[in-house]
Every structure is written in C-alpha cells, then in structure tokens.
C-alpha cells in the first residue's frame, strides 16, 4: 500500500508504506484474539517506548480483523541473513548494545507499566512471544544502522497484581524455539520470567550473529537440534532429563547452548 510520505514520532522513522496484518482462522478465536491484541497494542506501543511497534489503525472487513502498522524493512532474522558478515568493531558493538538495551527497556515497560500505574491502572504485562520474527528492523533518520522494534502482541497478556505469577502453562500456546522450561514441566506456571528466558535466547543469537555472522547463527541453530522426549526433533535451548529412580523430569540448558555462551563450540576468537 503506497501513500504519501509522512513523519511519525517513533525515533525519527518515516513511512511511505504500511503493513496490514489480517487474523487468520488459525489464530485461535478471531474475535477474542483481535480484542486481546488490540487492548495490548493500546497499552503498549511506540508512544510508550520507541522500541515498541505502533498500531496506526484497526478495522473489520467481511468478518475479518485487520491491524495497520508501519512497514518494517525486515525482521531481525532477515536482517541477520542479509548482513551475513557484520563488522566486529566498536561502532557495531555499540549499536548491538544499544538495541539490546532498548529492547530490554521496551519489555520492562510491558512488565512494569508505570505509564498505566500513573493513570491508576494497577497491573503487569507479559509479551509472551519474543523471537527474531517478532523483532522488526526499521531504517531511522536518527541512526544510520536502523532500530530494532518489538512487535506482535498477539500472545501478550495483562494481569492484576494477584495473578501476575500463577498462570497455568496449560492456558498458553506451546510455541517452539525460544520457549522456556516451565512450558513443558507438569504444573508449571507462566510469569514475566517467561519473557526473560526468551530475551536471553534472543540476545544469545544476536551476539552469535555479531561474532560470526549468519553462518554461525545457522550452525548454532543446527547444533541445538536434538530428539525431545516426545520423539520429535527440535532446537529449543533446554532438554528434559529423567531423574534417576524417580518418575519425574528436570530441565537442563543444552550443552550446545552453554558452549556457545562461553565461545567453545565454534572456537570464535
């Protein structure tokens, strides 16, 4: 959708294209999903923090639900793939550090929304789906390297103080990839710590890209692949290990993850 060039508040971004998101039948219950995502986008957006995506408009057409957003140049994973060999210099290190800090601050504004508390609304949010596909890269007039923005509030939630840490894991979709151990442990509960785990996974892959480019990211993703207790192959960051002599399992971070964390696995100098 091409339109006249406009200026927007969010960190000096300029848009001449927009992204239109349509909820598909697979997106749970369309109306329920639409209302939840709309409420979260009203609470948490680029007007609250520069590293959160901004909802521009919503509408329904032929019983389908639509969201209108600024058009991103790429997702974070697409950015990694396009910039295959980033420079390992001070300037790039500062940019990576700045983006990590900005993403952390954006998530903190969801976890501890002081802008809502100042309005008398008491509660705590959780994003619930942090992954490279949901981190968008935008060009910016304020930074020649662009800016990373957290998007997709479809799985996010907002809870009152009393319920912020006791949501049963049976009530959330079991997303692959970055999901934390509490998703798979019987009786596990979901809290804001869910986002902290997924942030750690994201930042580890981001640093892997900076240290070794897209090739190293692919190697790391491949190295994490293992057979899960269900028999399926996945590349999540942990595995479940049966406790000897007992009918229960404990979660452990995969050796491949701790190795790359200490730069052993691929001998990055």
Predicted regions and their residues:
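Structural motif at the C-terminus of the N-lobe alphaC helix and the adjacent alphaC-beta4 loop
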Residues: 40-50
């Amino acid at each position: 959708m091409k339109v006249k060039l406009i200026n927007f508040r969010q960190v000096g971004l300029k848009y001449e294209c927009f992204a239109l998101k349509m909820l598909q039948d697979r997106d749970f219950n369309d109306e329920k999903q639409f209302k939840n995502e709309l409420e979260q986008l009203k609470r948490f957006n680029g007007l609250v923090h520069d590293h959160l995506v901004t909802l521009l408009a919503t509408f329904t057409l032929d019983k389908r639900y639509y969201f209108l957003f600024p058009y991103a140049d790429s997702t974070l994973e697409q950015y990694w793939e396009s910039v295959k060999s980033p420079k390992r210099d001070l300037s790039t290190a500062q940019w990576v550090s700045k983006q990590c800090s900005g993403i952390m601050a954006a998530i903190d504004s969801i976890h501890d929304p002081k802008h809502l508390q100042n309005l008398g609304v008491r509660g705590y949010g959780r994003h619930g789906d942090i992954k490279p596909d949901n981190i968008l890269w935008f060009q910016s007039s304020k930074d020649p390297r662009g800016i990373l923005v957290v998007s997709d509030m479809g799985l996010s939630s907002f809870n009152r103080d009393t319920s912020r840490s006791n949501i049963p894991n049976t009530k959330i979709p079991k997303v692959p990839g970055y999901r934390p151990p509490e998703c798979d442990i019987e009786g596990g509960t979901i809290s804001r710590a869910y986002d902290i785990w997924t942030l750690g996974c994201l930042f580890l892959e981001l640093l892997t890209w900076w240290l070794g480019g897209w090739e190293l990211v692919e190697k790391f993703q491949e190295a994490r692949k293992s057979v899960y207790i269900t028999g399926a192959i996945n590349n999540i960051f942990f595995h479940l290990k049966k406790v000897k002599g007992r009918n229960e399992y404990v979660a452990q971070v995969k050796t491949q993850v701790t190795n790359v964390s200490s730069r052993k696995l691929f001998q990055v100098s």
